[in-house]
Amino acid sequence: MHFLQNSLIAAAMGAALVAAAPAADLDARSSCTFTSASAAKSGASKCSTVTLKSIQVPAGETLDLTGLKSGATVIFEGETTFGYKEWKGPLISMSGDKITVKQASGAKINCDGARWWDTKGSNGGKTKPKFFSAHKLNNSKIQGLKIYNTPVQGFSIQSDHLTISDVTIDNSAGTSKGHNTDAFDIGSSTYITIDGATVYNQDDCIAINSGEHITFTNGYCSGGHGLSIGSVGGRSDNTVKSVTISNSKVVDSQNGVRIKTVYKATGSVTDVTFQDIELSGITKYGLIVEQDYENGSPTGTPTNGVEVEDITFKKITGSVDSSATRVNILCGSGSCKDWTWSGVDITGGKKSSKCKNVPSGASC
């Protein structure tokens, strides 16, 4: 009898342990903290909450968070740093569906780009790693990250339904030697929203090379090349459509707002609105549309292979430096049309003598 009772008790305890094991395993996977890049790479895809605690990413390696579990939350905690090596990067790569990316209070991502900066950016000198690959990061959110001193380009975005809010990219230390430190480069993407970005850099605050339904709003851009569409043309995807860039400030930058298309290329830029943009301390062009871009430089001869149609410039105000040009429109024959132009009031600087094929209603 005692033997039977003991056997029953043992069996019951064993059954309880077997039942508890999967639950414990699930608990372990629901929230994970990683302190190394290798551990995060091998384990993050199993976790619903991924905490990255003061990770020191080894030189030449990517903090690889691709293939995250659907609905996962990623939290940067402490200071994330990266070892030095000349390579193309990216320093961080992330993909998944319905992902939320944020940081704990006081956290920062410190790229220490000064180790690579040599005034040449991605045009020579040291090979520099790009910062963050957000490719196939769909139906997701990136919130409140504080990023310092990217070696070259910041976010490379090829995703659908991605919202980036209240992100700071501070490359102000790169004023003398930083170059090509674009904050947000967008290509082949749909329904991208960037809201409340604060950017100090040495290239485009945003550059939209292709994509549809893209919004940039409530931004502050300092030190770079302004708010840009393009360059468009010469890629596999050369369509920009349904873009709104609004309620933003561009200060101490080369350009204010810009559309640039590639010389002799084909493509289209349609349904684009620049609205409520305030400029100050602009050193080259307050507003520029140029269809003569070749190998990174203007030729002075625009071509008409890229349509720039249904464009709105509304309430673009502020000032440019005395040596700068207020507005420059250099369009190919017949390629710029159906523009809406109202409340464009840029002061200082000089009037352009190079405008060509200015569409009806616009003023150069």
From Swiss-Prot:
It is found in: Secreted. Optimum pH is 5.1. SUPFAM superfamilies: Pectin lyase-like. It comes from the Eukaryota. Optimum temperature is 38 degrees Celsius. InterPro entries: Glyco_hydro_28, Glycosyl_hydrlase_28, PbH1, Pectin_lyas_fold, Pectin_lyase_fold/virulence. Residues 1-20 form the signal peptide. Disulfide bonds join 32-47, 205-221, 331-336, 355-364. Transmembrane segments: none annotated. Residues 21-29 form a propeptide. One of its GO terms (cellular component) is extracellular region. The keyword Zinc does not apply. This is Endopolygalacturonase B.
